């Protein structure tokens, strides 16, 4: 069997070295013949820098993988096996603009929540569907792994408006799993079974099993005591009100602070915008540092500075998912896929982020116990926002946008 052809849309992203590292670590199970890094004219220099680093990393590993950097998406997609989507429509300047406009009007300016998430989705979804249409023609059997934000809305748009095989990914469940493993003082995170359910950046940990025992109450107690390693680097680590977690009986992901602790987060964002800058401005400076390192002809590993990006572990999750599909691993991962009844009270055709069994045929979402009514209403409200946003992005209808 010949090796795999893997295509990365947004190949000039600073995250790509983590993806390459993950592919190299799994080469014995998932042999890659060629890696195509696709970008646009504005990203031409970055994608060439990434391609150079990729070749050095591959050589250091003693492997032979063709690396192609290109602006020609069509030639890249032809006969691909897996396509990873990690592009940012409008680049970081658009994100910064979203943040600044939101804060100007006293609103949270986060790239996947509220006004910022809406604007990002409207820019991104039409491009994502263009890519999906290209895949229908050029690689109809390929899997699309989407971690372009807002991942849940982008994934749902693709699932509902194209015929390709697609799965959405997020690093938040990965970070939560690693954090819970730390709290349980467990050496191997694979021994910890975590069930999550909800929407992208709106998930709840519903169950934690280790060696046959339920540990959710103990982990909640640890978090309430001030030990919370479940927070990504890009989210302010405000302490949850203890009554909230006790009342929920679940662990909300860090992004739910934007809803349960909105006023605190808004004050923090306003203070940061007046000081070191918005998150987008901070990331822009970090990317300059990263690409200065990536240019170094002696660098042949993923630099530690990459851990400063909030999306740490996105690429790790992507490689694990590719491996699970390719080898029919039948492992549990937490992905964005069609609901199909997994969460009662949400449409069957909508995208949800749930624990799923990953097979060669894709993810099989695991049914979850009914949510408490108050939490379900929040999920339904957010899903209505997402579906109206998708409709507005595809139709350009201003009235639909206002409804969202």
What are the roles of these predicted feature ranges?
Residues 2-15, 43-47, 127, 154-169:
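Conserved N-terminal glycine/acidic-rich loop preference
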Residues 188-404:
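Long, compositionally biased stretches enriched for glycine and/or charged residues
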Residues 17, 143, 147-212:
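Rossmann-fold dinucleotide-binding core
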Residues 93-160:
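Rossmann-fold NAD(P)-binding glycine/threonine-rich loop
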Residues 28-62:
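Glycine-rich phosphate-binding loop and adjoining beta1-alpha1-beta2 segment
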Residues 66-79:
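Short acidic low-complexity segments
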Residues 5-31, 35-38:
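N-terminal Rossmann-like dinucleotide-binding module
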Residues 78, 84-85, 146:
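Redox-cofactor binding/interface segments in oxidoreductases and associated redox assembly factors
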